Amino acid sequence: MHVLILEDDIDLGQALLASLRLEGISGVWVRSLREADAFVAEAPDCVLLDLALPDGEGLERLRRWREAGYGVPIIVITARTALEDRVSGLDGGADDFLTKPFAMAELISRLHAVTRRHARQASE
């Protein structure tokens, strides 16, 4: 599995990348929407998407990707805890939504779950 991590926080980005590697999952970590657009074209198996980014709003990019037909599973990871943010993320096309701080084991489980669902839907 190959994951695109879009997270502007350096400590969290490095921790996510290291944790995924320990699980045998490869990944690319980027800190901006501009960088992410280049890697989205490489079709990762899943995207971990922060909402508050230095060059824009992750939710708006999520909606744009979905409108363009980008079907790769996307898990939103954010410090925003309001119900409206969770609903907006899921309605905007996220496959899952996880608020920070979170346990890495939970993220890994959710990552496997969304990629399994995606693979099952693709085979139907």
Region spans (language model):
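N-terminal/domain-start alpha-helical segments
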Residues: M1-A122
